[in-house]
Amino acid sequence: MFHQTFNDKKLKNIKSKVTKMIDNIKYSFKKLINEKEWIDKKTKHYAFKKLNSMRSLFYDMKNYTLKEMETLYDHLRFTNESTFEEAKESLKTFDVLLTKKKKLLNKLSLTSLFQPNAAYKLTENRISYNLGIFMKPYFDEKLPMSFNYGGLGYIIGHEITHGFDDDGSQYSEDGKKFNWWSDEEKKIFQEKSNRFIEQYNKNVEKVSGYNVNGTLTLSENIADNGGVKAAFNAYRKYLNELGRDELKIPGYEKYSNEQLFFIAYSQLYCSSFTFASTYYLMMNDPHSPDRFRVLTTLGNQKSFSDAFKCKVGSKMNPKDKVVIWKTGK
């Protein structure tokens, strides 16, 4: 399955494009920080240091060639006559050899190879990307970059923002606990965070009838809002460098580049859950329900209301938008 889906040339092209996207989104996020009037020069220095030191960890595919995998699987020898202990010993040997072969397996497991996921680890200031995140609906080489920035770009921006959310902002560039914010800045950040809590607390999930827990979901809500903003600004930078509109996709001709970006983001959270699943997620999941990851997040984005010309004061263009990472104050 792996080698039918990917090959060395394709992986190299994907990594090249994604690395460029990461650089653009980091640049975009750096501008968001630099424009903050409530953050002083000393704090900005630490923030830039952390952002510049933030690493990206991809799977090293050289260790997963067909020949290498066949050699490893030769150690998995089972017959009808094999005892349980023999089978267990064979699996143990395979696991040891595989771990030795792949030094990164302690950070990225083989079983999650195709899971579409990325994760920020604050104690290492590192974002890990599973291979599945480089496939639809997050990324596709054949689609315009509006889809890729709205999908994977948002994911990248989301994880970067975690480095500066209510938890990540307490850690340094090398992943150690460090207070690099002034008391006044922490107070302002907390005030802005409280506004997010209040906003999301008002959201009522239709299936369960429960209100969203804005405190439980705070970090993810900050990351959603900051991630979309950083990715969109990075996409605009890409368009400026391109010097023209992207090619249109049949069936989507009526949408602008900017609108396609937000459509790509929104379709990531097209979902349906049972009452039991919804109830469990509402009580335990640090993410807001998918509906509000789209509607509330985009309602806070001026770029969204500008792109779709939403009426001022409407649900998708409220006068009082809640933001942490925006131009100026």
Segments and roles (model prediction):
Residues 2-329:
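Intrinsically disordered, low-complexity linker/terminal regions across diverse proteins
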